[in-house]
Curated annotation (Swiss-Prot):
InterPro entries: NA-bd_OB-fold, Ribosomal_uS12, Ribosomal_uS12_bac. Belongs to the universal ribosomal protein uS12 family. With S4 and S5 plays an important role in translational accuracy. Interacts with and stabilizes bases of the 16S rRNA that are involved in tRNA selection in the A site and with the mRNA backbone. Located at the interface of the 30S and 50S subunits, it traverses the body of the 30S subunit contacting proteins on the other side and probably holding the rRNA structure together. The combined cluster of proteins S8, S12 and S17 appears to hold together the shoulder and platform of the 30S subunit. This is Small ribosomal subunit protein uS12. Part of the 30S ribosomal subunit. Contacts proteins S8 and S17. May interact with IF1 in the 30S initiation complex. The gene is rpsL. One of its GO terms (molecular function) is structural constituent of ribosome. It comes from the Bacteria. SUPFAM superfamilies: Nucleic acid-binding proteins (SSF50249).
Amino acid sequence: MPTINQLIAKGREVRAKRNKVPALQGCPQKRGVCTRVYTTTPKKPNSALRKVAKVRLTNGYEVVSYIPGEGHNLQEHSVVLIRGGRVKDLPGVRYHILRGVLDTQGIAKRRQRRSLYGAKRPK
């Protein structure tokens, strides 16, 4: 426990907040090119084949991004837009790919939460 005089002399050190999405550099989204599109398995106790892509961003960072929704049209050299947001059961996946933007198609049959998946309003 510091004395009053020690606090006056030095003060308290404020802990720096860790950035959860460093590759975005404070931007809401970033554009990048897929270098590899593959599936990976989640941590225990879950079981699935999660679709992910390794993306090289315009600022030079290379990150692993999750491809949300059922089915996708991404392949190597596809241009995508990524946003922040991790996938809890995939270690190292801290970004999401935006659907319905650039080379990523939206989901055609989607009826609910359409804006998240780039789906047009059904007639």
